[in-house]
From Swiss-Prot:
Residues 136-325 are annotated as: SBD. GO terms for molecular function: SUMO binding; transferase activity; zinc ion binding. The keyword Disulfide bond does not apply. This is E3 ubiquitin-protein ligase SINA-like 4. Zn(2+) 2 binds at C175, C180, H192, H197. It is an enzyme of class 2 (transferase). GO terms for cellular component: nucleolus. The RING-type zinc finger domain is essential for ubiquitin ligase activity. The SBD domain (substrate-binding domain) mediates the homodimerization and the interaction with substrate proteins. It is related to the TRAF family. Residues 1-12 have a biased composition (Basic and acidic residues). A zinc finger (RING-type) spans 86-122. It comes from Arabidopsis thaliana. InterPro entries: Sina-like_RING (IPR049548), SINL_plant (IPR044286), Znf_RING/FYVE/PHD (IPR013083), Znf_SIAH (IPR013010). Its EC number is 2.3.2.27. It catalyses: S-ubiquitinyl-[E2 ubiquitin-conjugating enzyme]-L-cysteine + [acceptor protein]-L-lysine = [E2 ubiquitin-conjugating enzyme]-L-cysteine + N(6)-ubiquitinyl-[acceptor protein]-L-lysine.
Length: 329
């Protein structure tokens, strides 16, 4: 009878494989859980193939199928980046990140300041690293804060983000017109200026680089400034006058962020009188917002002495060029 059983089965291995298929199929039917039903179904499909997994234990096959399941999402969006800040100093978290036994976090500098005592529960902190959060910080990408002004750069959270924003060419610049709240990319500023403020031709002085322009600076106006627009490239410059105890301090500014990618300029600024001229070569500062009249400049200005200030109107001349054109002899 033993021989007949072997002859009818066609071999012991086939009998064991059949039993294994029946046992696994019954498990997939008995469990009503959707997640596990999907997993058991995968096992059944694997068993019906001719692969070598017929001889593997059920536990090994289940583990193999789990690895074949659909991977997790490639990106995650955080509604608020505050979760990536140190809860003590509120600076961006960066390696190393430490945690106490209750799971409270602290950056390296805060651990030193707190003398390795958690600020929330007073337990020791500073010896156990929070590797999970360090991985999140390392893998996370954050958009530049200037994205609303056109920047498309994304960097890892922490030091790299701060480093990028310090040199981002899309850093916002304010319109030089008083009481205007417009803020935007510096190359868009001139379009806003012309479209919104409807200024008359005399209020904007057009010029070409390295060509002198004669203009008047009125000291009786509230803003005491003159705006210049370069005809070809549209760069926006402002000459401001600040009245001080020794005379008038005249400055020249380029409305743009102070970053390496933005072109740097210098200028020749002169006070013209019938029988005398006061001239100075100046470095033109890039600024994102004009100084108020209360902020007297400390550097890079032409001081026009009181004896050369006659009345409220001064005749002046300016020529603007590249960074070293007017500051090096």
């Amino acid at each position: 009878m033993t021989k007949l059983g072997r002859r009818n089965d066609g071999g012991g291995k086939s009998h064991r494989s059949s039993t294994k298929r029946q046992r696994r199929t019954s498990v997939s039917v008995d469990d009503p859980s959707p997640g596990e039903e999907e997993e058991k179904t995968l096992v059944v499909l694997t068993d019906d193939s001719d692969s070598e997994e017929d001889d593997k234990p059920l536990g090994d096959v289940l583990r193999t199928c789990r690895k074949r399941r659909v991977s997790s999402p490639k990106s995650v969006t955080l509604p608020n980046s505050n979760v990536l800040e140190c809860p003590n100093c509120f600076d961006p978290l960066k390696k190393p990140i430490f945690q106490c036994n209750n799971g409270h976090l602290a950056c390296f500098l805060c651990c030193i300041k707190l003398k390795k005592r958690c600020s929330f529960c007073k337990l020791p902190i500073g010896d156990v690293r929070c590797r999970a959060m360090e991985k999140v910080i390392k893998a996370g990408l954050v958009s530049c804060s200037n994205a609303i002004y056109g920047c498309k750069q994304s960097t890892t959270y922490g030091n790299q983000l701060q480093s990028h924003e310090k040199v981002c060419v899309f850093a916002p610049c304010s319109c030089p017109i008083k009481d205007c709240n417009y803020i935007g990319f510096y190359k868009d500023l001139i379009n806003h200026f012309r479209a919104t403020h409807k200024v008359s031709p005399g209020d904007i002085n057009s010029f070409v680089f390295d060509r002198p322009v004669i203009f008047g600076l009125d000291l009786d106006s509230s803003d005491k400034m003159v705006i210049f627009v370069e005809e070809k490239q549209g760069n926006l410059f402002v000459v401001q006058g600040f009245i001080g105890s020794h005379g008038v301090y005249a400055t020249v500014s380029h409305i743009a962020p102070m970053v390496p990618e933005v072109r740097k300029f210098s200028c020749s600024l002169a006070r013209l009188r019938p029988y005398s001229t006061l001239r100075l070569g100046l470095e033109v500062k890039n600024i994102q917002k004009l100084r108020s009249q209360e902020e007297q400049p400390q550097e890079d200005f032409l001081l026009i002495p009181s004896y050369m200030v006659n009345g409220d109107h001064m005749k002046m001349e300016i020529s603007i060029g590249d960074k070293n054109d007017y500051t090096h002899i």
